[in-house]
């Protein structure tokens, strides 16, 4: 009898413990009448009317809700709670599908929120707006800019990567495949030539980067564009035990210039090394080390390329090199193999140091005082200056540290970062004015004249 009683109680406990819990499902979707404001932003304020460049528009939809605000009265020291109305950004997946659309000034819907043209006259100011139901954004003005003169002769820059490999007895050895180097250079070429971007202000440099196929003695290279330098145990030990060996590697390159600095009139030199294990968001000392051009032909004014200190020199040969960075740059192996390792979300792109090597300046501006008199930071009027600390994303604004957003002398402008010199960017384009600067450097700076020789591709002068 007792056994049946125990079974009965166990059965009752079983059923009571499995009672279905009540569930509450909240519908977080926003109703149209809960939307209070629509904001429209664009990729840039100018569009090139070439039928390739596209102006992308981005909508930001806001709502308002009454919430409780809590605080403490400074005089009475008593705590209080009161209702206030707060505006909040509505996530796109909580909006009704296709409820917000972007229109041109004639009321035409923009397919995919992009606008491109070949017929709008330069100087035309087009207006666009976003609309959902009866609610519209403010009008956004976009200027159609002049078509740039792209009647350049295409130049091919031969590149040699020098792999500085430590001895296996002292540090992990490594290798980099020719296929990887080719892919890296192809992407740089594509970024320089407007092939992988929708940037509305992208330029076409007609500059191509290719791996050299002949070495400095005129012999065909077994692995195109790849020169391996095996550092001896003695030399590596002399570099010390620090995890950062930037200075030591630069000195090593110069001391062994006959092997690993190839004629700058025939090659663009890039040295790959694990010169530091440090990381930084900017990458300018951890991903690569470089110098802007240092010499200009005497036919040109030194001030013709502003922002760079140069001197006149009509030729630049191996015998003129006092710092290897005058004729190339050093690249951290970690940045090449794992682009986010040393720069975090500001993913490394080989196009960045190559553009700087060709005279383009950084667009970021950490302090308001860094700006030039015309409100610029890189001497290219069609790029935006920005404080990367305020905008760690591809979507940025031009307000800077210490400058209020409502400064009437510098109205707030939002833009999208495609530029290879922007931080937190798609890094897939150069602007039209940056392209002009690159072409000036290639024409005027003797240390950047490797493209004038076919030696790297033929083994002959």
Where are the model-predicted features located?
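The catalytic-center signature of Zn2+-dependent metalloproteases
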Residues: 324, 329-430
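Extracellular/periplasmic catalytic domains that process cell-envelope and extracellular macromolecules
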Residues: 150-155, 201-203, 260-266, 318-325, ...
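Propeptide-to-catalytic entry region of secreted or membrane-anchored zinc metalloproteases
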Residues: 103, 133-264, 275, 443-450, ...
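Short, aromatic- and glycine-rich surface loops/edge beta-strands on solvent-exposed regions
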Residues: 121-134
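Active-site-proximal segment of zinc-dependent metalloprotease catalytic domains
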Residues: 247-366
């Amino acid at each position: 009898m007792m056994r049946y009683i125990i079974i009965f109680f166990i059965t009752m406990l079983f059923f009571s413990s499995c009672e279905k819990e009540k569930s509450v499902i909240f519908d977080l979707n926003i109703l149209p009448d809960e939307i209070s404001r629509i904001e429209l932003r664009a990729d840039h304020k100018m569009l090139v009317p070439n039928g390739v460049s596209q102006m992308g528009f981005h909508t930001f939809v806001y709502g308002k809700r009454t919430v409780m605000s809590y605080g403490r009265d400074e005089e009475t020291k008593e705590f209080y709670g009161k209702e206030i109305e707060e505006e909040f950004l509505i996530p796109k997946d909580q909006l009704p599908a296709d409820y917000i659309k972007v229109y041109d000034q004639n009321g035409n819907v923009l397919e995919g929120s992009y606008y491109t043209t070949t017929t709008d006259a330069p100087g035309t100011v087009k207006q666009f707006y976003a609309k959902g139901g009866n609610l519209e954004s403010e009008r956004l003005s976009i200027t159609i800019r002049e078509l740039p003169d792209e009647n350049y002769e295409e130049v091919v820059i031969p590149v040699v990567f020098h792999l500085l490999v430590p001895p296996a007895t002292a540090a992990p050895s490594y290798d980099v495949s020719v296929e990887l180097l080719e892919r890296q250079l192809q992407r740089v070429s594509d970024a320089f030539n407007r092939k992988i971007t929708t940037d509305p202000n992208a330029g076409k440099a007609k500059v191509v980067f290719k791996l050299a196929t002949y070495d400095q003695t005129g012999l065909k290279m077994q692995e195109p564009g790849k020169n391996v330098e095996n550092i001896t145990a003695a030399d590596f030990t002399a570099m010390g035990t620090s995890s950062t060996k930037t200075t030591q590697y630069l000195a090593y390159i110069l001391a062994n210039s006959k092997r690993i600095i190839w004629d700058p009139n025939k090659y663009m030199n890039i040295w790959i090394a694990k010169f530091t294990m440090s990381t930084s968001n900017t990458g300018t000392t951890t991903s690569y080390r470089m110098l802007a051009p240092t010499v200009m032909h005497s036919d040109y004014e030194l001030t013709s390329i502003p922002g760079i200190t140069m001197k006149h020199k009509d030729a630049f040969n191996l015998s003129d090199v006092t710092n290897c960075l005058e004729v190339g740059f050093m690249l951290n192996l970690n940045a090449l193999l794992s682009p986010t390792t040393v720069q975090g979300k500001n993913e490394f792109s080989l196009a960045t140091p190559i553009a700087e090597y060709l005279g383009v300046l950084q667009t970021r501006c950490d302090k308001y005082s860094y700006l030039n008199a015309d409100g610029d930071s890189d001497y290219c009027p069609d790029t935006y200056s920005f404080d990367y600390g305020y905008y760690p994303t591809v979507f940025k604004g031009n307000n800077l540290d210490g400058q209020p957003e409502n400064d009437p002398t510098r109205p707030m402008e939002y833009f999208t970062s495609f530029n290879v010199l922007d931080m937190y960017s798609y890094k897939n384009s150069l602007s039209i004015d940056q392209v002009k600067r690159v072409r000036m450097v290639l024409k005027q700076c003797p240390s950047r004249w490797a493209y004038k020789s076919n030696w790297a591709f033929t083994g002959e002068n």
